[in-house]
Amino acid sequence: MSDHKRAVLAGGCFWGMQDLIRKQPGVVSTRVGYTGGQNDHPTYRNHPGHAEAIEIVYDPAQTDYRALLEFFFQIHDPTTKNRQGNDIGTSYRSEIFYVDEEQRQIALDTIADVDASGLWPGKVVTEVSPAPDFWEAEPEHQDYLERYPTGYTCHFPRPGWKLPKRAEV
């Protein structure tokens, strides 16, 4: 376990994010929760300022942070502020919560690549912030789409979506 790394991402409703990210190669575990808000021990009904987020534990021998971010930018729209599909509000913002300086720099570089690529019609509005406390969501929200495969989601892989680095654009 000590060789594993941690990532925290917010990109809209956490159900769809978790369902897709947990299936990625190198992802060891995921859990959904709340982060970046004003209260301790937030709940689904009381999480002022918090984003719905996913905490990812991954094996860096099988994947890297950049690959996770590239998939993150593929499955949600990073150009809409405080919104994903029908979900509107700061809970559904696009935000990368970095755990160290290396993650911060990779996040900024990846955002610059997304902006330069033209894969999304507008500029990226994803925020990049230090990772505050992560509060695990209630059990009914964990692995929601695994239990309810036809449940609500606004996250989708985009076939053929490949993010080039700026030097390759």
Curated annotation (Swiss-Prot):
Belongs to the MsrA Met sulfoxide reductase family. It is an enzyme of class 1 (oxidoreductase). PANTHER family: PEPTIDE METHIONINE SULFOXIDE REDUCTASE, PEPTIDE METHIONINE SULFOXIDE REDUCTASE MSRA 2. Its EC number is 1.8.4.11. Disulfide bonds: none annotated. This is Peptide methionine sulfoxide reductase MsrA. It catalyses: L-methionyl-[protein] + [thioredoxin]-disulfide + H2O = L-methionyl-(S)-S-oxide-[protein] + [thioredoxin]-dithiol; [thioredoxin]-disulfide + L-methionine + H2O = L-methionine (S)-S-oxide + [thioredoxin]-dithiol. The active site is at 13. GO terms for biological process: protein modification process. HAMAP family: MsrA. Has an important function as a repair enzyme for proteins that have been inactivated by oxidation. Catalyzes the reversible oxidation-reduction of methionine sulfoxide in proteins to methionine. Keywords: Oxidoreductase. Gene3D superfamilies: Peptide methionine sulphoxide reductase MsrA. It comes from the Bacteria. GO terms for molecular function: L-methionine:thioredoxin-disulfide S-oxidoreductase activity; peptide-methionine (S)-S-oxide reductase activity. InterPro entries: Met_Sox_Rdtase_MsrA_dom, Met_Sox_Rdtase_MsrA_sf.
